[in-house]
Amino acid sequence: MILSDRDIRALLAIGDLVVEPLSGDTVRENGLDLRLGRGFCRFKRSDRVLDPRAPGSPGEFYECGEGDEIIVGPGEHMLLHTQEYIRLPGYVAGLVNLRSTWARTGIYIPATVVDAGFEGQLTIEVVGSGFPVKLYPGDRFLHLVLVKLQSPAMNPYRGRYQGQRGVRLPKLFAKNTG
């Protein structure tokens, strides 16, 4: 069942759902509008193979930083994050969508599920369109549809990305670098 604005406000009121900061326009008819954060990681162009079983450094494949504006180049892949820190209860999952306005610029994001029990800022992959697009931190960028599970998850999310802030690179680097 997709949660309505009324359902979402009820979960916020009892503390089962947390969204920080929570702006007046965050709760929408059937989900949450989330704002773009300042951090980014650009995928570097390289002929080097990223081998998940070999030691490596994320610096070989990503260039990370922060900015007051973020330009996504044509066909460029980037990792971005939300301003909001969220906490989902063990009986709610989320489906991440790009807000329609941004999709109309040609920017694309892959299908992304937020697992029941997840807590943190969302890291999202963005793929550029046929021309550069400038993004501004603080703009409403993603729409998170919340779905109530038929029963609570037996094992809510407790993975490596739990509690993340800013852009989090793939966990395979953490496994191989220390």
Swiss-Prot record:
Asked if Hydrolase is a keyword of the record, the answer is yes
The record, for Pfam families, names: DCD
Q: Which GO terms describe its molecular function?
A: dCTP deaminase activity; nucleotide binding
UniProt: dCTP binding residues: R99, S100, T101, W102, A103, R104, D115, Y157, Q164
Any idea which UniProt keywords this protein has?
Hydrolase, Nucleotide metabolism, Nucleotide-binding
Keyword Nucleotide-binding in annotation: yes
Which residues are the active-site ones?
Answer: E125
Name the chemical reaction catalysed here.
dCTP + H2O + H(+) = dUTP + NH4(+)
The UniProt function text for this chain reads:
Catalyzes the deamination of dCTP to dUTP.
Q: How does it assemble?
A: Homotrimer.
Protein name, UniProt field: dCTP deaminase
